[in-house]
Amino acid sequence: MERAIFAGGCFWCMVQPFEEQAGILSVRSGYTGGHLPNPSYEQVCAKTTGHTEAVEIIFDPEEISYKELVELYWVQTDPTDAFGQFEDRGDNYRPVIYYTTERQKEIAEQSKANLQASGRFDQPIVTTIEPAEPFYLAEDYHQGFYKKNPRRYAQSSAIRHQFLEENWS
């Protein structure tokens, strides 16, 4: 099994697209990239810990490759927005691909270069590619949020889905 970590704005919106793929064993919401051990949601939202909201994905590389996960990641995000994603603003919502191995780093960097070269976006691709840091599991009420709170999830993801439809379909 392998591990991937992606930050793409609110972690509520990043779970379902990955969870629906064959070869995914788990998708957990949490926090990474900051300086405070085991931060709370409130601390991360206060923008004082340096963490991003992210998802940790455990996957079977025999069924789905890391490259496929990176490609799926792109189409869940606005890779031209370094200051958050959609209605979620601030450093804690910035887009980041966290790599756990040098091979993951190479795959992510090549994928980013390919996306930039594709001309799909007029602006530069600003998603950063950074080494993975400790991943702290978010509180239980954040896990599987789209299943537990479908109406609130639909409301909170509406702007994202509109962008994805307009730019990735």
From Swiss-Prot:
Signal peptide: none
Sections of the chain in a coiled coil: none
Annotated InterPro entries: Met_Sox_Rdtase_MsrA_dom (IPR002569), Met_Sox_Rdtase_MsrA_sf (IPR036509)
The keyword Oxidoreductase is assigned to this record: yes
Family per similarity comment: Belongs to the MsrA Met sulfoxide reductase family.
Cited function: Has an important function as a repair enzyme for proteins that have been inactivated by oxidation. Catalyzes the reversible oxidation-reduction of methionine sulfoxide in proteins to methionine.
Protein name (database record): Peptide methionine sulfoxide reductase MsrA
Organism: Streptococcus pyogenes serotype M28 (strain MGAS6180)
